[in-house]
Amino acid sequence: MGEKTGKFLWIDLTVPEAEQIRDFYSAVVGWTWDPVSVDDYEDYNIKTPGGELVAGICHRRGVNNNLPPAWINYVIVESVGASLDACVSKGGKIIDGPRKQQEDVFVIIQDPAGAYIGLYGKE
């Protein structure tokens, strides 16, 4: 990951009714969207009015059932395993994962103040 370590990579929102929230943000900030097939339903990639891919809005179902209804920013880390060890030793909690995504893994943690963040990188 090198020079990208510590940078924000992606933002996801996981909610019970993704279509309703997708339409809300489309009206409020002008986002457009593309469907992403997941099992027997669709989640959504969110784009700016100019077409730049910026976020995801996901259903709180299946593997995402335990995720909080919050915007979660994902940060690139060198080693998800080492970051998880540091998280727990400093009073944080592992909320979900680690989960595999292509060659990398991601995990959602909660810091000691209660805020959520995602970590993305090599195992």
Regions found by a protein language model. Name each.
Residues 1-2, 97:
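Short helix-capping and inter-helix turn/linker motifs at the boundaries of alpha-helical repeat units
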Residues 8-12, 70-74, 117:
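Short, structured motif recognition centered on aromatic/hydrophobic residues
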Residues 102, 122-123:
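A short acidic/small-residue loop/turn micro-motif
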